[in-house]
From Swiss-Prot:
Keywords: Disulfide bond, Secreted, Signal. One of its GO terms (cellular component) is extracellular region. It is found in: Secreted. Disulfide bonds join C61-C72. The keyword Secreted applies. Pfam families: Secapin. This is Secapin. The keyword Disulfide bond applies. It comes from Polistes hebraeus (Paper wasp). It comes from the Eukaryota.
Amino acid sequence: MKNYSKNATHLITVLLFSFVVILLIIPSKCEAVSNNMQPLEARSADLVQEPRYIINVPPRCPPGSKFIKNRCRVIVP
């Protein structure tokens, strides 16, 4: 009977320890989630950069060819 009580004591100790660890971990996880729950405008305000002006510049073609209809075409003399 002594062996069973020793196992039960060990089991209760392990369960209590894991319960305390869970109580310590859960609040930190909830805090991280609440920080992430800010409105999208507040979070994306830091990420917004000034708009870049896109200039449509045709690609450079190799010598002897011209850019015609979105492609480099070889001009035959």
